[in-house]
């Protein structure tokens, strides 16, 4: 099996349309914060990566104490503690939002200030949870454990999802030219420890949470697929702007013939063959 894997990888490299694959497009910055141990940091980052991939976009990672890279979307998963993000770092992110970016934050037991003026909700009280939150989002119910419950009162936010008693847990608000989104539950940390969360058909559509705030970056991709188990990377090359190399990967245990949605003005150079289980194939998009 090892020798076959090496042969298959050699065949994959030989099939690439270019000897040197350009770097792939990254659409968002995932910010890793303080007050998390190694497992928590890895879990939050891993889930953020997978939720992004299943929605058809890619992330780059950076630590919160680094200068924030310019991006249309910032993802801050599983914020913990009072010092998970320092005030000046938080304000620096908000400046990016004022300029037009989108900021998504999910909370573990983290605290943010300012809060109400940014997110459009007021915290009336905070209490320890004795049972997981049952969240109604669209036509699905999502069950998520969390150490605390924030009892929120809406002021100017849009409520995207709420608990069964109406308490908002996922909200969106305008801030300057951009948008802020807040999830008061540790989505990413929980999913990382939930067997089958990303592929079992019995699981709800967890990627819906990321799709709610990432539509603007997803819409900019040249190729998309509705299958969460087929992931894509785009490798634009400034030297040949009329072409874009792409790679599709089948992350399932069965063969898949992927169906793509191609951006206006582009087309497949040739049809992609059926993808074998747990394998990938390169293809090229060309301008019409």
Residue ranges of model-derived segments:
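Short, well-ordered secondary-structure micro-motifs within conserved domains or adaptor modules
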Residues: 68-83
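Extracellular/periplasmic catalytic domains that process cell-envelope and extracellular macromolecules
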Residues: 22-25, 68-69, 98, 174-175
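Hydrophobic, well-ordered secondary-structure elements that form the walls
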Residues: 28, 59, 246-248
């Amino acid at each position: 099996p090892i020798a076959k894997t090496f042969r298959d990888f050699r065949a994959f490299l030989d099939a690439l349309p270019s000897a040197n694959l350009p770097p792939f497009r990254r659409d968002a910055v995932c910010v890793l914060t303080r007050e998390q141990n190694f497992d928590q940091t890895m879990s939050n980052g891993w889930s953020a990566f997978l939720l992004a991939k299943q929605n058809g976009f890619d992330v780059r990672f950076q630590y919160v104490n680094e200068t924030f890279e310019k991006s249309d979307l910032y993802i801050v998963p599983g914020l913990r503690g009072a010092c998970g993000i320092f005030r000046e770092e938080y304000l620096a992110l908000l400046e990016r939002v004022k300029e037009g970016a989108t900021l998504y934050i999910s909370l573990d037991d983290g605290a943010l200030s300012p809060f109400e003026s940014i997110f459009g909700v007021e915290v009336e009280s905070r209490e320890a949870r004795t049972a997981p939150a049952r969240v109604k989002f669209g036509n699905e119910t999502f069950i998520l454990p969390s150490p605390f419950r924030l009892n929120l009162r809406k002021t100017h936010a849009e409520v995207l999802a709420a608990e069964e008693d109406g308490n908002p847990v996922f909200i969106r608000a305008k801030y300057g030219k951009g948008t802020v989104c807040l999830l008061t539950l540790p989505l990413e940390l929980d999913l990382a420890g939930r067997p089958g969360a990303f592929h079992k058909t019995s699981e709800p559509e967890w990627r819906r949470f990321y799709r709610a705030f990432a539509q603007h970056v997803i819409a900019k991709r040249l190729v998309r697929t509705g299958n969460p188990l087929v992931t894509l990377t785009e490798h634009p090359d400034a030297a040949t702007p009329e072409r874009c190399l792409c790679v599709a990967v089948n992350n399932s245990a069965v063969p898949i013939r992927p169906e793509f949605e191609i951006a206006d003005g582009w087309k497949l150079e040739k049809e992609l063959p059926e993808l074998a289980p747990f394998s990938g194939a390169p293809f090229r998009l060309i301008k019409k």
